[in-house]
């Protein structure tokens, strides 16, 4: 390792040129032969786009004031824009349990160790025990939705800690579930 990661090369912004006159400095080619051919930003050493005429990353192109057509479009999309624009009532309809069909739950193992399989097989199928539920406010990331109420629960089963979150689904008109509080 030659310690080239700490070298910063600065150059003044070009004056209406289409291609910089200096050859690119490729730190990756010096350090690792596997990455030869990648473009590296001439200012900071980060990866630069192949199409960038100024041979810089997006951040350096923007901060130096280069008029780069490669970095005009942004590929970043905010998470709020990717969410569906459904209202909270529509989301609750999607989350309601269909009482006509029996639930089909299957556990998929995340590991194949014998200890994990033995642990899962040793857990009881159903438990009726007191638990502590902590009321909490749940807010959505989008701007227009109001906070909802949920409960966080933590229980110990067979010496193992389980944590979960209970989401509000509405009033139990059919009295299908036992009432845990009279408040």
Swiss-Prot record:
It is found in: Nucleus. PANTHER family: PROTEIN LATERAL ROOT PRIMORDIUM 1, PROTEIN SHI RELATED SEQUENCE 6. Belongs to the SHI protein family. Residues 79-88 have a biased composition (Low complexity). Transmembrane segments: none annotated. Residues 41-68 bind DNA. Keywords: Activator, Auxin biosynthesis, Auxin signaling pathway, Developmental protein, DNA-binding, Metal-binding, Nucleus, Zinc. Residues 100-113 have a biased composition (Polar residues). One of its GO terms (biological process) is auxin biosynthetic process. Zn(2+) 1 binds at residues 41, 44, 52, 57. It comes from the Eukaryota. This is Protein SHI RELATED SEQUENCE 6. Residues 79-121 are annotated as: Disordered. Pfam families: DUF702. Zn(2+) 2 binds at residues 41, 57, 61, 68. A motif (Required for homo- and heterodimerization) lies at residues 157-160. GO terms for cellular component: nucleus. It comes from Arabidopsis thaliana (Mouse-ear cress). InterPro entries: SHI, SHI_C, Znf_LRP1. GO terms for molecular function: DNA binding; DNA-binding transcription factor activity; metal ion binding. Transcription activator that binds DNA on 5'-ACTCTAC-3' and promotes auxin homeostasis-regulating gene expression (e.g. YUC genes), as well as genes affecting stamen development, cell expansion and timing of flowering. Synergistically with other SHI-related proteins, regulates gynoecium, stamen and leaf development in a dose-dependent manner, controlling apical-basal patterning. Promotes style and stigma formation, and influences vascular development during gynoecium development. May also have a role in the formation and/or maintenance of the shoot apical meristem (SAM).
């Amino acid at each position: 390792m030659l310690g080239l990661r700490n070298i910063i090369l600065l150059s003044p912004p070009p004056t209406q040129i289409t291609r910089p006159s200096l050859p690119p400095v490729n730190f990756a080619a010096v350090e690792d032969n596997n990455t030869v051919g990648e473009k590296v930003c001439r200012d900071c050493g980060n990866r630069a786009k192949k199409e960038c005429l100024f041979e810089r990353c997006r951040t350096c192109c923007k901060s130096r004031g280069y008029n780069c057509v490669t970095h005009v479009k942004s590929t970043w999309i905010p998470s709020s824009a990717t969410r569906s624009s459904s209202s909270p009532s529509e989301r609750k309809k999607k989350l309601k349990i269909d009482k006509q069909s029996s639930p089909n739950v299957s556990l998929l193992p995340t590991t194949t160790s014998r200890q994990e399989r033995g642990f899962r097989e040793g857990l009881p199928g159903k438990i009726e025990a007191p638990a502590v539920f902590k009321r909490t406010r749940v807010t959505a990331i989008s701007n227009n939705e109001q906070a909802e109420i949920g409960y966080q629960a933590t229980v110990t089963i067979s010496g193992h800690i389980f944590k979960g979150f209970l989401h509000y689904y509405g009033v139990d008109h059919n009295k299908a579930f036992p009432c845990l509080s009279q408040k």
